[in-house]
Structure formats: C-alpha cells, structure tokens
C-alpha cells in the first residue's frame, strides 16, 4: 500500500505553469483503495518499520473519504475555493464531534508530540500533502531526469479544492490536551538544527563589564576597573574572586581605567598611584605568609630573584610613570585617571613552590591592586581589587584551560540531552573562555598587605628614563610594608643557601701590586668609600687621612671615580691591580680591573 502511495506526488512541468490537471477528483482515485481497507497486519508491519505517523495518516484518509462528498465540499458559489473549504470544515465539525475518534485522537497526539525528526519514509509521505502542490519549492530535488510525456496523465487534483493541507484545516476546531512525548525518535534520522553554544553565559563583549550587581559587594568602590588580559577560569566556587591561570615568567597586560559610572571621588589631582602586588589571602596569618615567602626565596638560584617583574614595553612608558619596585612581590606606578593605563607584569613563582612536599596541591595567590590618591602618597586608599591566580610552568595554563573546557563540554552536553533530546550541544573550536579576567573590588580597605623584603640591600631599577628613589628613603611607603624583620625568625634557610643570605654589608676585594704574584684580600667592614680607605690603610699601614683619591680603571681603559654605588654593587669578589701614587704628599689609589 505504501509503495503505491509513493507514486502519487505531483510532478510539476517547468515550462507550462497553466497545465490543467487530468484527474477530475480524488474520490475516483481513492475508490479502489476503499475496496481493500488496511488490515491489522499491514498496520503492524508499518509500525515495526517506525512508520506510526504513516499508519495514522492513512487511517485518517480512509475515514475521510468514506464520508459522502456532499458533506465535505459545498457547491461552488461566488466565493473562492479556499473559503468554501473553510466553511465546509466548520459545517463538518458537528460530524467530527460524534465520530468514533480513536484513530483520530491517536493521530493528533502522535503528530503534535513529534519533534519534526522524520525518516526518509516520513519525508516521502509528507510530500503527499497538498502544501507541496501549492508550493513547488517544497518538493524534493529529483536525482533523475523527468519525462514530461510519460507523466502527462499522472497529476493529482487535490489542490483544485484546497489551499493548504486539509488535515490541518479540518481539525483546527478540535481541542486536544497537551501532548506528551511517547517515543524516542531514532537519532539516525535527526535533521540538522541550530546548535546552541554551551558557553553562551560567558560570551560577552569586552565593553561589557562582568562586575554585575550581585558580583560586587554592595559597599565596594566601583570607581575603577582593573583587568588582567588572561583567560578566566571556568569553574569558580560561589562567592570567590575570579581566577586566572598564568604561566611562570610570561608577561601579561594589566589594564586600569576609570569606570564610566563612577561616582565623584574627591581627588587632589587627576593622578593616582596604584600598587600591583602578589600576595596570599589577607585573612591568613602574616607570620605564615612571610614564612612561605622565605621558603620560596631560599630555593631561588639568586638572592635577587623577584616574585613580580615589570616589562619595559612601550605601552608602559606611554600610559604610566614612576614605576618603582616597592618590594619583591609588589611594584607601584602613577597614571592619569582620564586615560587607560596598561602595564605588563610577569610572575616568577609557581603555586607549588611554597611547600617542600611533592604532590601537594598548589596554593592559589591573589593579584591585588591598591590605588591611592597620588598627592597623599599611600595615606589614602581609594580602591582595592583582587583576583585569584594560579601559576603553572611550560604552558600549563593553556592545558588547564583545555581540561576545564572539556569538562564544561561534557557537563553541558549531558544537561542538554536530559532537557532537550533533539538539540545537540556543541563548543566553539579553539574557544578559550573570556579573554579578560576582571579583578573584583572588595570592601576591606583596612588590612595591610604583607609585602616581602628579604634581609638584603637592593636598589630600585631605572624604568623609562626615570631615576627611582630608594625604598628606604620614601617614608610614605613605610606604612604599606611589613618587613620580615618585624617577625621572629622561625625559618632557617637550607645550608646551600646560607652563604647567599649572609650579611650583605660586607664586600671582599682581591688586590695585588704589579710586582706581586699573590693577591691580598681586602675585607670592607662597610660597603662604601670610607670602608675601602680603612681597609687599604690597615693592610698597607698607611695613614687613612693621606688617602685622597680612589680611582677605578675598567678593562676598556676608562678611569672613573670610585664611589659608594660602585663598591656596593660592582666590586664584591673582583680582582684588581693596586697602584699607590704619591701626589703632593697625598696618596692616590688606582684599582685596575683584571
């Protein structure tokens, strides 16, 4: 039966759109099928092949054409054919209400609960609908050539009366209870549907701020926005600050700007001073924090290894000024609130560096940015923002992000299958989450951060052509720091590092005269010019007051005056040729570098 129906669709001739139909009506075409009604065996075979809709549709057509034609179609009048059909359906409504509707309700329930996923057999049956006769564009493309002559007499006449599918129009007035999904469609025959993005909750434009009302504490200052150009972690516990994954030693941009909806902040000028620091959670004991920093510092290859570094990029010089290394884990700079500031920072520690045990989970750190009124130094804190960071090595941040994306994909895929089985969840290829991590403003403006300054003397570096002051000379910053000397020495460095952490005030020089072959050691009690004079006086039994000039001659022949800075940083464990010259009763000392 179904094979015969497959040959009933209309074949449209492309050249003659006004071609008349050869068959007078559908009653004659269906009369021979009424003589052989569908049997239970035929229905069972069709249902076994998954063609429940076909069984219901054929049963409905059999019942429909058993009704006399006079009750189905009104005699043609002045109105159009489409209006006649609509009126005939209204008149026929009373007959439908009294009709035995077992097959009818079965068809409606199955039809309404379907998810528009059909097999190829269903698609063929759908082409029997009169909608395809009215709209030729809905017909499927044929793989073979059409022979117009062979099919001139093979035309259906259903659209001679109806404008659209009569089954839909006929049963519009019938009220059917809400359908329920009763069968699982075969996934093999699923049609392509628009695939939703599983990360649509985090796909946002850069201009949109992710700091929503429920994300920021109510009393937090929102005058400034601080962002870290690094992908934000997907899985974050509720109530925690956002987290970013970073690679050790890689530089990341940090952007600071004034929020568009900022309130009036009474600043003394348009400049503010921001301090970027890597700290532990401020709720932790300061002694415990310093103990961890000491443990990390003792395992570094050099005593001058810093926790946070700043890169000498052009973007830094154009947007910020007065970059200072406040501590080993902090740096400060000045920027204009009317312009967006950008600075590139790199972190030189791993999250697993703070424990001597292997296999211990890494300790998350906080990237904290404190902003002060520039004219008041660090006396007036006006904004504080924090985000969590985890530092990995060897591109570990990218691997961690990919792992989280796969977990998110599986979680979203399972939930999508449970809630809506006709939609396939997907993930954007190469998508790495949000490209920015917004630092969360906090309300705690009283807690002082623990900044790490080892027991060695270091000088601030010169950045962007600006000579920076020493950290000890800036009294405004003393309230910001917490030196390790303020706490008891509860940590001892390993023996391999104790020599590095010895008293840095001592400088050792190796000197000899040109006539000598063996060097003498000059131990300077103080790393300055006075200490050098005192050591030479004691070693060679010369009156210290007679030593007037001390020069250093470099390997390239440059003669420079020896000063405290050269002695402190460029003379320790260096070998020199000592030349003592008597000039007008005074002794002139020249150290030739070897």
From Swiss-Prot:
| InterPro entries reported for this sequence | CP2, TF_CP2-like
Q: Where is this region: Disordered?
A: 483-503
Q: Domain named Grh/CP2 DB: which ranges?
A: 220-453
* Subcellular localization(s) per the UniProt record: Nucleus
Q: Which UniProt keywords apply?
A: DNA-binding, Nucleus, Transcription, Transcription regulation
Molecular function terms from GO: DNA binding; DNA-binding transcription factor activity
Q: What top-level branch of life does the organism fall under?
A: Eukaryota
Biological process (GO) annotations? Answer: regulation of transcription by RNA polymerase II
Q: Which Gene Ontology cellular component terms are annotated?
A: nucleus
Principal location class: nucleus
Instruction: Extract the Pfam families matched here.
Output: CP2, GRHL1_C
- Segments for region (Transcription activation): 25-75, 28-91
- What is this protein for, i.e. what is its function? Transcription factor playing important roles in primary neurulation and in the differentiation of stratified epithelia of both ectodermal and endodermal origin. Binds directly to the consensus DNA sequence 5'-AACCGGTT-3' acting as an activator and repressor on distinct target genes.
Q: Which family does this protein fall into?
A: Belongs to the grh/CP2 family. Grainyhead subfamily.
Additional comment: GRHL genes (GRHL1, GRHL2 and GRHL3) show a paradoxal lack of redundancy despite their extensive sequence identity in the DNA-binding and protein dimerization domains and the fact that the core consensus DNA binding sites are identical. They have related but remarkably different functions during embryogenesis because of their differential spatiotemporal expression patterns during development.
Q: What is this protein called?
A: Grainyhead-like protein 3 homolog
Origin species: Xenopus tropicalis
| Gene behind this protein | grhl3
């Amino acid at each position: 039966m179904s094979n015969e129906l497959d040959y009933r669709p209309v074949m449209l001739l492309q050249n003659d759109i006004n071609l008349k139909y050869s068959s007078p009506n559908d009653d004659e075409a269906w009369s021979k099928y009424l003589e052989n009604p569908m049997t239970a065996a035929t229905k069972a075979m069709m249902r076994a092949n998954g063609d429940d809709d076909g069984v219901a549709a054929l049963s409905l057509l059999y019942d429909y054409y058993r009704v006399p034609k006079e009750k189905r179609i009104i005699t043609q009048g002045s109105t159009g054919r489409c209006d006649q059909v609509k009126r005939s359906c209204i008149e026929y409504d009373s007959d439908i209400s009294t009709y035995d509707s077992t097959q009818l309700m079965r068809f409606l329930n199955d039809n309404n609960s379907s998810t528009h996923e059909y097999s190829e057999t269903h698609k063929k049956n759908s082409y029997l609908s009169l909608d395809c006769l009215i709209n030729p564009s809905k017909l499927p493309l044929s793989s073979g050539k059409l022979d117009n002559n062979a099919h001139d007499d093979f035309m259906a006449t259903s659209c001679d009366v109806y404008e659209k599918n009569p089954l839909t129009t006929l049963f519009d007035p019938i009220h059917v209870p809400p359908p329920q999904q009763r069968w699982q469609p075969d996934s093999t025959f699923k049609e392509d549907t628009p695939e939703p993005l599983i990360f649509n909750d985090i796909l946002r434009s850069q201009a949109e701020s992710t700091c929503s009302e429920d994300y920021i504490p109510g009393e937090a200052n929102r005058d400034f926005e601080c962002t870290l150009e690094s992908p934000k972690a997907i899985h974050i516990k509720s109530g925690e600050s956002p987290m970013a994954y970073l690679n050790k030693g890689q530089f990341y941009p940090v952007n600071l700007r004034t929020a568009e909806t900022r309130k009036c902040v009474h600043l003394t000028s348009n400049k503010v001073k921001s301090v970027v620091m890597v700290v532990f959670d401020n709720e932790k004991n300061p002694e415990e924090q310093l103990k961890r920093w000491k443990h990390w510092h003792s395992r570094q290859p050099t005593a001058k290894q810093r926790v946070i570094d700043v890169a000498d990029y052009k973007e830094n010089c154009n947007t910020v000024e007065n970059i200072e290394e406040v501590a080993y884990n902090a740096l400060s700079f000045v920027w204009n609130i009317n312009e967006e500031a950008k600075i590139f920072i790199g972190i030189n520690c791993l999250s697993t560096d703070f424990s001597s045990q292997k296999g211990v989970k890494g300790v998350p750190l906080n990237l904290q940015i404190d902003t002060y009124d520039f004219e008041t130094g660090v006396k007036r804190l006006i904004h504080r923002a924090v985000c969590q960071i985890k530092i990995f090595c060897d591109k570990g941040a990218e691997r961690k992000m990919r792992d989280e994306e796969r977990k998110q994909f599986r979680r979203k895929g399972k939930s999508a299958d449970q809630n809506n089985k006709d939609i396939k969840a997907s993930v954007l290829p190469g998508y790495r989450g949000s490209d920015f991590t917004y630092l969360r403003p906090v309300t705690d403006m009283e807690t002082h951060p623990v900044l790490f300054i080892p027991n060695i003397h270091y000088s601030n570096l010169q950045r962007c052509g600006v000579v920076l002051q020493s950290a000890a000379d800036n009294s405004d910053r003393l309230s910001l720091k917490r030196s390790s000397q303020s706490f008891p020495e509860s940590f001892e460095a390993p023996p391999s590092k104790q020599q590095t952490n010895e008293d840095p005030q001592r400088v050792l020089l190796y000197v000899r005269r040109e006539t000598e072959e063996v060097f003498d050691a000059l131990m300077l009690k103080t790393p300055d010019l006075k200490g050098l004079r005192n050591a030479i006086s004691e070693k060679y039994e010369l009156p210290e007051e007679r030593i007037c000039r001390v020069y250093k001659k470099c390997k390239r022949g440059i003669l420079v005056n020896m000063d405290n800075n050269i002695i402190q940083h460029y003379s320790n464990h260096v070998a020199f040729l000592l030349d003592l010259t008597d000039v007008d009763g005074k002794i002139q000392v020249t150290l030739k570098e070897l």
